[in-house]
Amino acid sequence: LADMNTWVSVHCAPSSGTATRPTLTIASIKAFFDSQETVPEKMESKDQMGVKKALHPQGFTIDETQTNLLYALLQMRRLETCMQGLRFMDIKRYGIAFTHLLDGENPIYFKTGDLRGALQLPGDVIEAGMEPNPREN
């Protein structure tokens, strides 16, 4: 929580109009994310976008408090690493399903455990006899 407040102090102005920079607490983070709708795993329109996506962590469990803190942390990482291609590792680690809405085309759905998310082994490793990671067609 201290690191998150440090991040806020570096990235947010002390005040803007009548708003002032918040000091994050577990209660304030919980209140904010409890008030947000969870984004459906299969979005149909941009109106359904939001900061709260269902988490399905692979290999570990998280309680409600940890989930709300992770929502906040993931949003901070999303802002911090925008356009750097680093969000995909968080998507895989926390099992976040998402939808790409494309103008004039059918949406692309990426679900938890989607085989398209497995990084393929290098060609020389496959040629040496190791079985490649499975793919969906």
What are these regions (language model features)?
Residues 1-137:
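Acidic/polar-rich alpha-helix caps and helix-coil junctions
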